[in-house]
Amino acid sequence: MSASRFLVTGASGQLGRLVIDGLLKIVPASQIGVLVRGDKAAAEFAARGLHVHKGDYGRPETLTAAFAGVDRALLISSSEIGQRAVQHRNAIEAAKQAGVKLLAYTSLLHADTSPLGLADEHRQTEAALKASGVPYALLRNGWYTENYAASIPAALAHGVMLGSAGDGRIASAARADYADAAAKVLTADTQQAGRTYELAGDAPYTLAEFAAELSRQSGKTVAYQNLPEADYKAALVGAGLPEPFAALLADSDAGAAKGALDDASGELGHLISRPTTPLAAPIAAALASSR
């Protein structure tokens, strides 16, 4: 492809680092810029030959400098829930001023119709993108399998995996799958502006099936216990999670019970030209890291 200049915002996060790894397989480091907040991440990326910009979504002046001269950018959604819509608008405005030719945004699976509370700020951001006039692509990412894998140590300790997803099927995928998709969209020779991708795993599962796979791999019996949303939230708070985060997780599980995290389009596997990472792999990785 031609020597486009790329920018990845939020590059020091778990998804961002994987996107950079994917881009480096396709284009040279000299064409890639990153937006990071910390000195350590800035030094790490500079050592890899990338163009480093320090700043964040809450400081528009830093965004203007980062987007200058960029052809294609990935706006990774902020982790600051409740402030994301404003922060994302700052980034969109900077991209508009810079004349960015494609701004890809990591949204949420079926964001326009999703019952998840998490979808609200994604809908606001999508609306801002559409109103901005900036050519955009929506990467509506489903759930990360790693989100559930993070609960494995507690599940093994207590012999039970709690949730409120009922029999809802969850078409999650590994972060690396979504990262590869983002890298493919950013570097595609085909027209991407105006595209909306509903991205999810190939093999949906229930949390009971997750618990069964965990039991199989660990050799310990782990049962799935379904709770009402309020009780699950209370259990998470009791385990030490901040109340807002506990509420978000419980709401997401309740949404999963309604089908909000399921999808059968196969778009993610098609986009990355391979099957998405099977459920067994992140569970195995989590077990290996806990030993």
What are the language-model segments listed below?
Residues K40-A47, A288:
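Polar/charged alpha-helical tracts
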